[in-house]
Structures are given as C-alpha cells and as structure tokens.
C-alpha cells in the first residue's frame, strides 16, 4: 500500500530545524502560511498544528486553520485503531487547551511514534507516552484502509536478535532516498551535496 500523500509531504520536510536566536526559518514560516495563518511572522510560535495543516494542504486537503493542536480532535473522522498517517492528538501538561499533534508512524504498548513539526524544534520522529493520546483522526476521504497499514510495533528481529524498529526503518529509507546515505563523520553537515 502507498503512504498517504500528506505523509510523503511530511517526510520530505524531515530534518527542517527552527532557527535558534534571532531570525526565522523560512520553511517554518511557510508552514504557517500554508496552514492558513499568514499573519504569523515568527517561528517561535508553536508550530506543530501549522506543520500538520501545511502537510494536509500539500495533499489537497484542508486542515483546521488553527494553531491549537487540539483543534484536530474535531477534524476529519475518528479512528478506533491507529493507521500510519493518522493525525494523533496528544495532551500536554495539565492545561486542558494545550496539546501536540503529529502523524502516527508507529506504536507499541507504551509509546506512540509521531512524525511531526516542532518536536525538539524540528521536523522529526519522536516517541510520546501512549497515555497522552486524546484521539486519532483521519481525513473524510480517502478511507484509511485504502492507503495505510495499521500502525504497530514490528515483531521481526534484526541481525542482532532485537526487535526491528519500524520507525527507524522508515527514517533510514527516507535518509537513503533523499540524502543518498549517511556518514559517521562528525564534520559532515549532511545533505545531498556532501
């Protein structure tokens, strides 16, 4: 099965990092614009929902237009079981309005693995406590069974006898496709021209 179009768009942004200090990251400002919030001019404003909305827009779908992660609890249709690409909405602290949103790429009993924006100030895959999950959502069209596999931990073992990590496999495939490989050289800044 193919990955959903919004996931292809999100993987293409993998590694974008927020500018530290003065100045703003053009890619992050573009996420605000594409999500319908061209009024935001600084990347210091929380941008996980902007990233989610921008990736949906790139796939020809409307997001919520809000910068509130929890706004996605009312978007699309609810999912009972997680699918790769599902919009996962999480709680954040004790504030009933605060949250985080990203795209589900894997899960196990304890953790959800999300591809999302503003995760350690970057577009990355990060693990979150599964107890924080408030809801999983899916666009009204296409149906999840048409494009996405259930998100679960892999049971296959790697050459070291440990369980294979499906999130690592996805990330590695992306790096190999986009960058042509990787290096252990600490002076190599990465990128396709190196």
Positions of the model-derived regions?
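Glycine-rich, acidic and aromatic/proline-enriched surface loops and short helix-turn segments
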Residues: 11-19, 54-61, 107
């Amino acid at each position: 099965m193919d990955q959903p179009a919004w996931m292809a768009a999100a993987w293409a942004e993998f590694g974008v990092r927020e500018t530290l200090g003065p100045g703003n990251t053009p890619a992050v400002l573009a996420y605000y614009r594409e999500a319908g919030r061209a009024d935001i001019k600084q990347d210091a404003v929380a941008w996980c929902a902007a990233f989610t909305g921008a990736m949906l827009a790139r796939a020809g779908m409307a997001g919520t237009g809000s910068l509130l992660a929890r706004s996605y609890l009312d978007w699309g249709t609810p999912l009972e079981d997680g699918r790769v690409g599902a919009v996962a909405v999480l709680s954040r602290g004790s504030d009933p309005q605060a949250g985080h949103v990203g795209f589900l790429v894997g899960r196990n009993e304890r953790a959800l693995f999300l591809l999302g924006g503003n995760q350690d100030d970057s577009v990355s895959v990060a693990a979150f406590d599964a107890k924080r999950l408030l809801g999983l959502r899916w666009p009204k069209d296409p149906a999840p069974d048409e494009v996405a596999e259930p998100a679960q931990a892999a049971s296959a073992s790697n050459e070291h006898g440990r369980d294979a990590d499906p999130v690592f496999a996805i990330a590695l495939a992306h790096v190999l496709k986009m960058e042509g490989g990787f290096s252990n050289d600490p002076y190599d800044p990465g990128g396709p021209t190196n």
